[in-house]
Amino acid sequence: MRSAKLKFEKRRSRIRHKISKTSNRVRLSIFKSGRHIYAQIIDDSKSITIAAASTLDEKRKKSHCNIEHAIKVGEEIAKKAYAAGIKDVVFDRGGYKYHGVVKALADAAREKIKF
């Protein structure tokens, strides 16, 4: 039987492989820890991070990874992307299942940028 970490890594690599086929768009990448959630907009062709937002920002220093704060992070990353002139991204859920905080962040970001 496979361990949970191995299943996660397999899901993650499968998602990245599918995303690599759409190299003409930038990628909205999600990372979740036990306490915080992070979002980055990455241009893989230039290997640079264009915008980033997380619950670690000064405004939300004591906040944790829950749906309420994931919505705020999603709105913030969408605002930063729109300011940078990005209107179209590929969503990289990073091996996480699409529910809870990942879904909340994605839905909040969809209001300003197109997936």
Curated annotation (Swiss-Prot):
Quick check: keyword Magnesium in the entry?
no
- Per the UniProt entry, the disulfide pairs are none
Top-rank lineage group of the source organism: Bacteria
Q: Does the keyword Signal apply?
A: no
Q: Which GO terms describe its cellular component?
A: cytosolic large ribosomal subunit
The processes (GO biological process) annotated in the record are: translation
Q: Which CDD domains match?
A: Ribosomal_L18_L5e
Which GO terms of the molecular function aspect are on file? 5S rRNA binding; structural constituent of ribosome
Q: Which UniProt keywords apply?
A: Ribonucleoprotein, Ribosomal protein, RNA-binding, rRNA-binding
Record's function text: This is one of the proteins that bind and probably mediate the attachment of the 5S RNA into the large ribosomal subunit, where it forms part of the central protuberance.
PANTHER family to which the protein is assigned, alphabetical: 39S RIBOSOMAL PROTEIN L18, MITOCHONDRIAL, LARGE RIBOSOMAL SUBUNIT PROTEIN UL18M
What does the record note on quaternary structure?
Answer: Part of the 50S ribosomal subunit; part of the 5S rRNA/L5/L18/L25 subcomplex. Contacts the 5S and 23S rRNAs.
Family from the record:
Belongs to the universal ribosomal protein uL18 family.
Name assigned to this protein:
Large ribosomal subunit protein uL18
Query: Which organism is the protein's source?
Result: Rickettsia rickettsii (strain Sheila Smith)
Gene of origin? rplR
